[in-house]
Each structure stands twice: as structure tokens, then as C-alpha cells.
Amino acid sequence: MDDIRKTALDRFRLYLERRQFSAHTIVSYSLDLRLFFTEVAVPLAQVSFREIDRFVDQQHQDGRAWATINRRLNALKHFF
């Protein structure tokens, strides 16, 4: 993960802590974002619905449960 994404993830964790999300949610959302960052190669400022839709499709094809996919989408919603 590059420095920009690492900094963004650190700031996101602080945001979640300030909003008093549970420790479990903070860990889960952080892992979800790391996965998204790994699978989506475009710069953060250029992430669009298309990349998120492809990410969801790939998660579904990989056999992820809809509850997991929806949690990952929720993490992305809070991040962006």
C-alpha cells in the first residue's frame, strides 16, 4: 500500500474512533478498505461507481456472503 492510501486509512481509523464506532467495526472496516485498495488500482481521487461496482461483482463471484459485501460497501460509504 502506498503512503497516500496508508495515510488515508490512518485518518479513516481516527474518524471512526471519534464517531465512537466499536473496536470490532474499526478493525473490520480497515481490513475491508485494505482489500479494496489492493484490488482497485486507480488513484483514490478517481474512484468512481464503476470501480465499486466491479469490486462488488468480484466479491460476489468469489463467493462472499451478501452480509460481508454489504459491510464492505458500508465501509466504503463512510470512507468516501
Locations of the language-model features?
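A detector for short, charged/polar N-terminal pre-domain segments
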Residues: 1-6
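N-terminal core-binding DNA-recognition domain of tyrosine recombinases/integrases
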Residues: 10-80
